Regions:
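Phosphate/NTP-binding elements of NTP-utilizing enzymes
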Residues: 2-315, 332-337
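Short acidic, Gly/Ser-rich segments with clustered Asp/Glu that frequently serve as metal-coordination loops
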Residues: 317-325
Length: 338
């Protein structure tokens, strides 16, 4: 029997560098290599990533900017966390921020899926130094210096610095907040830990994961910009799919169960959360949808007339036999006269 060849330390280092570079380009294959197997049957235990999930992971490693619009039930948060955990393991001293509308929502995303991630990939538990999963903020510290933290999509995120942002429900993110508080977080490039020079192959990332919304929002315009940058090979990529994609790969609910939901919800909810269609009449409307929605909430509600101004009431009476769309809407408008 031929004895195995033992490589010199320098040769071993070269091989490990090649393998690390390969896994950074194909992070899904790294998880495949680390997937536990049944000791008796030899069959893999846990998740078998499908092509759409593999594309998701690879895009977040390879591109500086990505926008993902997937339906409910696609498994966005789970695959997003798998990608972030994998990057933290493969790239030492990486700082990743997971953001959402509020700090509580961002923390809950990790809190709900952390145990599930470790159950499917037990090796990750040995890579984690400390994990704090609280409602007012969550963080995970890895033994190689990498870290995942949570932030809100608001001005409260200002001043932080990191290498990657994953923004959940980013359709609600306005351009003003993005430009002022979110984008500057990844302004500093990832540096080689030994030389402190810019790393030539590790890029900072801005990644957005959401369901669709109105075309008259900053998020839709950002999608158009990323689409053009994708055409120009300028570091961006966009992806999207309806509820049919996970079903086609045998994941999630059955088709009949999803179609039952359609009968219970409004048409707009169905289009944006399951069909993944951007809705609305014009992407260049005079009134921004997010500004209009924000104006619907009064800081100090008026319970009765002040006797000085005029009030108008508009009523849209529901006439649908469909319970999901049988909702009457009432709008009260106050007119301020000069």
């Amino acid at each position: 029997m031929k004895a195995p060849t033992v490589l010199a330390p320098e040769q071993q280092k070269d091989k490990w560098q090649e393998l690390l570079a390969f896994w950074c380009w194909f992070p899904d294959l790294f998880l495949d290599a680390c997937t536990p197997k049944d000791p008796e049957t030899g069959q893999k235990i846990g998740i078998e990533l499908d092509p759409s999930q593999r594309m998701f992971m690879r895009s977040m490693f390879r591109f500086e900017r990505t926008y993902h619009c997937y339906s409910r039930g696609w498994g966005k948060t789970m695959v997003e966390l798998l990608t972030n955990y994998t990057k933290c393991v493969l790239v030492p001293n990486t700082q990743i921020f997971l953001t959402s509308s509020t700090m509580k929502l961002a923390a809950n995303l990790i809190k709900q899926k952390h145990a599930e991630v470790l159950r499917f990939y037990p090796f990750l538990e040995g890579e984690i130094e400390k994990a704090s999963l609280r409602e007012n903020g969550a963080y995970i510290i890895f033994k190689n210096g990498s870290r995942i933290d949570t932030l809100p999509n608001s001005q409260d995120a200002k001043g932080n610095r990191g290498n990657q942002i994953c923004s959940e429900e980013s359709a609600l993110l306005t351009k003003a907040v993005f430009d002022d508080a979110i984008e500057p977080i990844v302004s500093e490039p990832y540096k080689n830990q030994r030389t402190q020079k810019r790393h030539p192959y590790i890029v900072n990332g801005l990644h957005f994961i959401t369901t669709t919304y109105y075309v008259s929002t900053d998020a839709y315009r950002q999608n158009l910009n990323y689409a053009q940058e994708m055409i120009d090979l300028d570091g961006s990529a966009i992806f999207g799919a309806s509820w049919r994609l996970p079903i086609a790969f045998g994941r999630g609910r059955r088709e009949a169960d999803v179609l039952k939901i359609k009968t219970r919800v409004s048409p707009l909810f169905w289009l944006t959360n399951y069909e993944e269609r951007w809705i609305g009449g014009s992407s260049n409307s005079l009134v921004d949808t997010m500004t209009l929605i924000k104006s619907r909430t009064l800081e100090n509600p008026e319970i009765e007339s002040d006797g000085k101004n005029e009030y108008y009431m508009g009523v849209d009476v529901a006439r649908s036999e469909n319970d999901g769309n049988n909702q009457t809407s009432i709008v009260v408008v106050k007119t301020l006269r000069d």
